Amino acid sequence: MVIGLFFLKAVPSYSADKNPAGVTGFTYSITFPDNQVKKDLGYFKLKMDPGKNQQISITLSNPGTEKVTIDVKLNGAKTNQNGVIEYGESTIKNDPSLQFDFTDIVTGPESVELAPGETKNLDLTIQMPETSFDGVIAGGIQLMRANQNGTSSNEGGSKIINQYAYVIGVVLQESEKVIAPDLKLNSVKAGQSNYRNAIFVNYSNVMAAYLDNMTVEVQITEKGKETVLYERKQTAMRMAPNSFIDFPVSMNGERMVAGDYVANILVTSGDKKWKWTKDFSISDKDANKFNERDVGLVQEKGLDWKLIALIVVGILALIILIFVIIRIRNKKKQEKELALKKERKKKKQQGSSNGKSSKKKD
C-alpha cells in the first residue's frame, strides 16, 4: 500500500484565499495584516523590520457535522528534483547557504480542533531575526485533517491511498531590494531516481532569492571521449531561495558501469548563465549496488539465461538418464527373452533326441 499526499496550494505560483471544504473536511480564509505587500495574492507576502514580532491569522471553519482535528506543520521552502518548489512537508534537507530557517522564525500550535459548525483562528507568531538581511525568507503552512482516510485507487496492482492538505505560502522580506540568484555546483555522482539508475547533478541557489524560468542541460561522456552517453534537458523550472536541487539524468535503463566520466552542465535563466564541467567516477561497489537495486534490471534478470541454461542441461541430463535406464531394462529384458528362447530350443532338441533313441530300441 502506498500513501500519496496531495497539496492544495496557495503559494507564490498559485492564488486562492478562499476554498471549499472538499476532501479535507474544513475550509480556510486568510486574514491579511497591514504589512501585506499585495492583498490579492492568496498567500502571505509580508514586509517586516529586523527583530519585529508579529502575529498572523488563518480562519478555519468546519461546515460538517463531525469534529475535525487539523494538523499544522510549518515547512521551509525547498526545491525538488523536478525543479518544483515544495512548501509542504518533505524529506529534502536545508541547503548550507540558508542563514535563517523559516521554521525557527515562524511558530504556532501543532493542531487545531473544530467542533461541528465551529470557526476558529489559527494564530502564528513571526519573530524576525535581529540581523537585517537582503532577499526573502520563504516557507509554507501545511493544514491537513488528522486521521484522514483519503481516497483509494489501484494502480499496477498496488493500492494507493490519496491524502490531501492545504499549503499556504509565506514570504518574508525587509525591503523591496531585488537581489540576483546565484548558483554553485556541489557534486555529480551516481544514484537512483525512482529505483532506476541515474546520474545526479547537485547544485545550490546560494542567494535569498527565487530563481524562475530555469533551463538545465546536462551531457554525460566517458572521460577522454566525446560520445554522449546520457543527456537531459528540462525547461520551466524554479528554485527556492537558499535551496539545492538534485537533478537526475536517467541512464535509460542501462546497467551502470564503473569508470571515469565527465558531466557538461549548462543552466540558464533569462540572460543569466552558469556553465560547469565536472569529472566524476563510479566505483565497482556503487555500480554493483545500484544495478542490484534497479527495478528495470531486476525485471530483466527475471530471464536469467544462466539459470535457464542450467535448467535445460538438467532436463537433458534427466532425459538421457531415463533413456539409459530404459535401454538397460530393455536390453536385460531382451537378454532374458533370448535366454528363454535358447532354453526352450535346447529342451526341444533334447526331446527330439530322446524320441529317436526310443524307436531304435523297439
Q: Where in the sequence are the language-model features?
A:
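Terminal connector regions
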Residues: 66-93, 127-176, 255-294
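Membrane-proximal extracellular "stem/stalk" segments
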Residues: 173-310
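Intrinsically disordered, low-complexity Pro/Gly/Ser/Thr-rich segments with frequent PxxP/GP/PP motifs
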Residues: 92-132, 221-256
